[in-house]
Amino acid sequence: MLKTEWKEQGFIDEPVAAGTDLKAEIRRLCKEKDAIILAHYYTIGDIQDIADFVGDSLALARKAAETDAKIMVMCGVHFMAETCKLLSPEKTVLCPDLNAGCSLADSCKAADLKKFKDEHPGYQVISYVNTTAAVKALTDVVVTSGNAKKVVDQLPKDAKLIFGPDYNLGNYINEVTGRQMLLWNGRCHVHERFSVTKILELKKQYPEAVVMAHLECKGPVLAVADVKGSTADMLKYAKQSDAKQYIVATEAGILHELQRNCPDKEFIPVPPEISESGLECSCNECQYMKMNTLLKIYNCLKHEWPSIEVDPKIASDAVKPIEKMLELS
C-alpha cells in the first residue's frame, strides 16, 4: 500500500534496517522480479556499479527498445524514463524519484513549441532527446548529442528546420553542417557554467592534457576543446588515445566510468565559473541526476513505484520520432 506522503513527494524514503546491504538487496529484487537497472553516466558511482547497463541517452534508448526484462529501473532523469516507456510500452518502467527533472526539458513546453510551429509553417522539428513526451509528440525526429549531426545530414538539404531545446548543440550542428536551423533558446544548467577561462587555467597546469567538452557547452568552450562530442564519444576517445591526462568539461559523473575504463589515466574535471553572487557551487554536477540513490532504487523495486505512464495519444505520436532517430543512427 503506497503512502499518501510518498505519492506527494514523488519517491519512497522507507527506511531499511541498519546494516542492510542495499546493493545486494537491489540485485536480489532484480533477479526475483526480472528487472534490469539502466543508469546514465551522470549518476553516482555506486549506482553505475550495480547497473546492468550504463550509457548515454542514445545507448539507453537502444537498450530500452531491445530488453526482454519485465521491469526497467531508469536511473537518470524523468524524460529518460518516459523514453523507455515509449519504446517498451508493455514493460513496467520505474523512476526512483519523479522529481528528477531536466533544465533543458523544462525550457521547452509543448504549448510553447506548438505555438512556435504554428508561426513557422513548413518547418520540420528536430527535438533533442532531453524533452518531454508531449514535446516529442510535436516532433519529426529526435536526436541525441551522439547522433545529431548524423541525423541532420540525412535530412533534405532544402528542409526548413527548427531545433530545440538546446541552443548550444543546435548552434554547433549549424556550424558543422552549414544548416540554418531555427534554434530554441534552452540550455543545460550544468554545461552552461563551463568557461574558457577555467579551461585555460587548467591547461596551464596540465599543458599536455587533452580537452574534452560536451556539445551542450557554449561555443567558445567547444572552440578550445580538442575533443567535442557526447559522453560516449569522450569515453571512446579516452580508451583509444595514448594521452595520459584529460580536462573534462561535462557533468562530473562521467569521471567514474572514465576512470574505471582507463585506470592509468588522469581525468581533471572543469570547475564551474563563479556565479554572480561570488559563490562557487558544485555546478559541474546535475542535482537531478544525483536524486537517484541506492535507497530509492531499492524501494522503487520493492514497491514497483514510481512507475511511468504516458497518455496513449501522446505516446503514439511521441514514439515515432524516436523510432526514426534509431533508424537513421
Task: Give the label of every model feature segment.
Residues M1-V248, L255, R260-V270, I274-S329:
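Active-site loop-to-helix "anion-binding N-cap" substructures in soluble metabolic enzymes
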